[in-house]
């Protein structure tokens, strides 16, 4: 079987989205504005969330990539697609239904997902992340459809190096990792906690201008003590009570060492770990790689920034008076 030669896919896809994203983060020009060389075609191309453009593929692209017949004949623009999707989104009966639709869109067409997010940022943020992501984590197993990110389970601890070695992760620069034990105010959600790293990485892209290929959500699945999850026939995680103590620490150590070896300069963000683990893991690894805990340092940094801004406003008002 002949390999499809690499051909450029037009820059009407993610490229223009990154231009909009970088307006939010002008100091982080991490995304390419160039057309991309791809060797996929047909079903493989339209099943790639990062490359799929849906009806926005031009006639020429449909010829080159064997897409005729796989797509309806209408050739639309990204703007047309946004209008269609925002209408479908607003027709949903609840925030969770909207969240589910957006997750499905992210897993099928990242270009359209981020375009929708960026152009309707105030409306979309509460759906992509808090508060709706909480229910998304609780019902994660119900709506799971396609792989996104990595589930590193305790039984696979000896395979972590191999899992991380896949070439699709060559360009990773940022990782958000959780063990699902303290998800927002909802407690232990086990593997459902993956909704948090996925949502946070979407914010890295939408608000920070960081290309999705540089972002990797990871869930450390060390079991769960949530009986509802363990008893549910739909639960997708490791059905086991949480690993604790030395076994837990050894597993995290294997994970961090694998990350350091694979990506020596990566940013590792710890997210929604239990109080008993959050600070001590940060203390243990903060000198080994670029890392921070969002619940400890991120919240504190934002609170400090808000106070400094308020002081500046108050001082400015006092001078004007």
Regions found by a protein language model. Name each.
Residues 1-2:
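Methionine residue identity
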Residues 5:
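Cationic, low-complexity basic patches in intrinsically disordered or flexible, solvent-exposed regions
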């Amino acid at each position: 079987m002949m390999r499809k030669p690499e051909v450029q896919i037009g820059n009407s896809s993610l490229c223009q989205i990154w231009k909009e994203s970088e307006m939010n983060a002008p100091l982080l020009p991490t995304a390419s504005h160039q057309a991309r060389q791809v060797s996929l075609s047909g079903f493989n191309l339209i099943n790639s969330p990062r490359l799929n453009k849906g009806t926005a593929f031009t006639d020429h692209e449909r010829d080159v990539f064997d897409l005729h017949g796989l797509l309806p004949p209408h050739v639309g623009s990204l703007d047309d697609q946004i209008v269609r999707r925002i209408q479908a989104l607003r027709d949903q009966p609840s925030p969770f239904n909207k969240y589910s639709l957006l997750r499905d869109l992210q897993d099928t067409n990242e270009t359209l997902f981020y375009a929708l997010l960026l152009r309707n940022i105030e409306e979309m943020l509460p759906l992509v992340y808090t508060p709706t992501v909480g229910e998304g984590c609780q019902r994660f197993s119900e709506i799971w459809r396609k792989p996104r990110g990595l589930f590193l389970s305790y039984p696979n601890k000896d395979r972590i190096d191999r899992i991380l070695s896949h070439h699709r992760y060559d360009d990773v620069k940022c990782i958000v990792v959780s063990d699902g034990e303290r998800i927002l105010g909802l407690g232990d959600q086990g593997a459902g906690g993956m909704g948090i790293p996925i949502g946070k990485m979407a914010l890295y892209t939408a608000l920070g201008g960081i290309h999705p290929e540089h972002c990797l959500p990871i869930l450390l699945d060390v079991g769960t003590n949530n009986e509802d999850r363990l008893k549910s026939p739909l639960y997708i995680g490791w059905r086991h009570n949480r690993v604790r103590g030395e076994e837990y620490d050894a597993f995290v150590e294997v994970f961090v060492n694998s990350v350091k070896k694979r990506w020596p300069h990566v940013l590792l963000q710890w997210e929604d770990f239990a109080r008993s683990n959050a600070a001590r893991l940060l203390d243990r690894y903060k000198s080994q790689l670029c890392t921070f805990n969002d619940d400890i340092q991120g919240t504190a940094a934002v609170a400090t920034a808000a106070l400094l801004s308020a002081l500046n406003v108050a001082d400015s008002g006092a001078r004007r008076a």
